[in-house]
């Protein structure tokens, strides 16, 4: 079957000749025509469509102006020039390739098969035979009437009570320290620091006046058991400052 591509479609259509234009090429199937006559200016898209509907060794007679660009389009679509505007479509050559069958027994990466035998499972709950000469343990020997109590480390060898003392030694030592300080004050003892009157910031850790505000020489204080109170306008124990040292006058 032949195809004539032209703008003028007034000619009669026969069974062996079809007259159409470039816009109608999409309606044709592949490998439809043996010969195509074309007198229109074709583009690369038109050359691709002409190559698709032309049979192998089919002939294209191009009646338009032939230039280098048209020739390049047609050659890119698989047609070669025969001169005088005639182009022939190349036959696609196919060659059968025989691929040898691969021997998978010696292929790379295959490992030798090693048959693995499963070991006999050990029965951990197997009944023990008591008829033998096996020694048994008397359960009565495991019992002990005595209760094991962890012995608390003694602090008798330490000079002072522990920081987290729970035996009462810490409270007893604090009470003894307070009694000793009060006894020293009542016996007209002299404090070596000489800064009790300045306030808590300048007093010792065991100073009996801790907690009291700063006082001046001649102010009256009253000592009642473990506490020291600041009193005014009462005749009681008197504190005096002599040579930078504090004395309790009883």
From Swiss-Prot:
<dbReference type="GO" id="GO:0016226">
    <property type="term" value="P:iron-sulfur cluster assembly"/>
</dbReference>
<protein>
    <recommendedName>
        <fullName>Anamorsin homolog 2</fullName>
    </recommendedName>
</protein>
<feature type="binding site">
    <location>
        <position position="167"/>
    </location>
    <ligand>
        <name>[2Fe-2S] cluster</name>
    </ligand>
</feature>
<feature type="binding site">
    <location>
        <position position="193"/>
    </location>
    <ligand>
        <name>[4Fe-4S] cluster</name>
    </ligand>
</feature>
<dbReference type="GO" id="GO:0005737">
    <property type="term" value="C:cytoplasm"/>
</dbReference>
<feature type="binding site">
    <location>
        <position position="207"/>
    </location>
    <ligand>
        <name>[4Fe-4S] cluster</name>
    </ligand>
</feature>
<keyword id="KW-0004">4Fe-4S</keyword>
<keyword id="KW-0411">Iron-sulfur</keyword>
<comment type="similarity">
    <text>Belongs to the anamorsin family.</text>
</comment>
<feature type="region of interest" description="N-terminal SAM-like domain">
    <location>
        <begin position="1"/>
        <end position="102"/>
    </location>
</feature>
<feature type="region of interest" description="Linker">
    <location>
        <begin position="102"/>
        <end position="149"/>
    </location>
</feature>
<feature type="binding site">
    <location>
        <position position="165"/>
    </location>
    <ligand>
        <name>[2Fe-2S] cluster</name>
    </ligand>
</feature>
<dbReference type="GO" id="GO:0051539">
    <property type="term" value="F:4 iron, 4 sulfur cluster binding"/>
</dbReference>
<feature type="binding site">
    <location>
        <position position="204"/>
    </location>
    <ligand>
        <name>[4Fe-4S] cluster</name>
    </ligand>
</feature>
<dbReference type="InterPro" id="IPR046408">
    <property type="entry name" value="CIAPIN1"/>
</dbReference>
<feature type="region of interest" description="Fe-S binding site B">
    <location>
        <begin position="193"/>
        <end position="207"/>
    </location>
</feature>
<comment type="function">
    <text>Component of the cytosolic iron-sulfur (Fe-S) protein assembly (CIA) machinery. Required for the maturation of extramitochondrial Fe-S proteins. Part of an electron transfer chain functioning in an early step of cytosolic Fe-S biogenesis, facilitating the de novo assembly of a [4Fe-4S] cluster on the cytosolic Fe-S scaffold complex. Electrons are transferred from NADPH via a FAD- and FMN-containing diflavin oxidoreductase.</text>
</comment>
<dbReference type="GO" id="GO:0005758">
    <property type="term" value="C:mitochondrial intermembrane space"/>
</dbReference>
<feature type="region of interest" description="Fe-S binding site A">
    <location>
        <begin position="155"/>
        <end position="167"/>
    </location>
</feature>
<keyword id="KW-0496">Mitochondrion</keyword>
<dbReference type="GO" id="GO:0009055">
    <property type="term" value="F:electron transfer activity"/>
</dbReference>
<dbReference type="InterPro" id="IPR007785">
    <property type="entry name" value="Anamorsin"/>
</dbReference>
<keyword id="KW-0479">Metal-binding</keyword>
<feature type="binding site">
    <location>
        <position position="196"/>
    </location>
    <ligand>
        <name>[4Fe-4S] cluster</name>
    </ligand>
</feature>
<dbReference type="Pfam" id="PF05093">
    <property type="entry name" value="CIAPIN1"/>
</dbReference>
<feature type="short sequence motif" description="Cx2C motif 1">
    <location>
        <begin position="193"/>
        <end position="196"/>
    </location>
</feature>
<dbReference type="GO" id="GO:0046872">
    <property type="term" value="F:metal ion binding"/>
</dbReference>
<feature type="short sequence motif" description="Cx2C motif 2">
    <location>
        <begin position="204"/>
        <end position="207"/>
    </location>
</feature>
<comment type="subunit">
    <text>Monomer.</text>
</comment>
<feature type="binding site">
    <location>
        <position position="155"/>
    </location>
    <ligand>
        <name>[2Fe-2S] cluster</name>
    </ligand>
</feature>
<feature type="binding site">
    <location>
        <position position="162"/>
    </location>
    <ligand>
        <name>[2Fe-2S] cluster</name>
    </ligand>
</feature>
<dbReference type="GO" id="GO:0051537">
    <property type="term" value="F:2 iron, 2 sulfur cluster binding"/>
</dbReference>
<keyword id="KW-0001">2Fe-2S</keyword>
<keyword id="KW-0408">Iron</keyword>
<keyword id="KW-0963">Cytoplasm</keyword>
């Amino acid at each position: 079957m032949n195809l004539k591509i032209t703008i003028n479609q007034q000619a009669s259509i026969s069974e062996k000749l079809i007259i159409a234009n470039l816009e109608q090429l999409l309606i044709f199937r592949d490998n439809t025509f043996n010969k195509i006559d074309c007198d229109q200016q074709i583009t690369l898209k038109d050359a691709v469509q002409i190559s698709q509907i032309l049979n192998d060794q089919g002939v294209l007679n191009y009646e338009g102006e032939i230039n280098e660009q048209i020739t390049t389009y047609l050659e890119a679509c698989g047609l070669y020039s025969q001169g005088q505007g005639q182009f022939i479509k190349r036959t696609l050559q196919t060659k059968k390739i025989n691929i040898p069958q691969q021997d998978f027994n010696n292929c790379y990466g295959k490992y030798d098969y090693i048959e693995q035998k499963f070991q006999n499972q050990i029965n951990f709950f197997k009944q023990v035979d008591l008829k033998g000469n096996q020694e048994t343990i008397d359960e009565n020997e495991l019992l002990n009437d005595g209760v094991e109590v962890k012995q608390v480390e003694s602090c008798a060898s330490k000079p002072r009570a522990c920081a987290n003392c729970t035996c009462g030694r810490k409270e007893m030592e604090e009470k003894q320290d307070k009694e000793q300080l009060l006894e020293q004050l009542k016996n007209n003892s002299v404090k070596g620091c000489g800064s009790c009157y300045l306030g808590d910031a300048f007093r010792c850790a065991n100073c009996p006046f801790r907690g009291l505000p700063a006082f001046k020489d001649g102010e009256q204080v009253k000592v009642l058991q473990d506490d020291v109170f600041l009193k005014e306008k009462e005749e009681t124990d008197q504190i005096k400052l002599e040579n930078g040292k504090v004395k309790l006058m009883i």
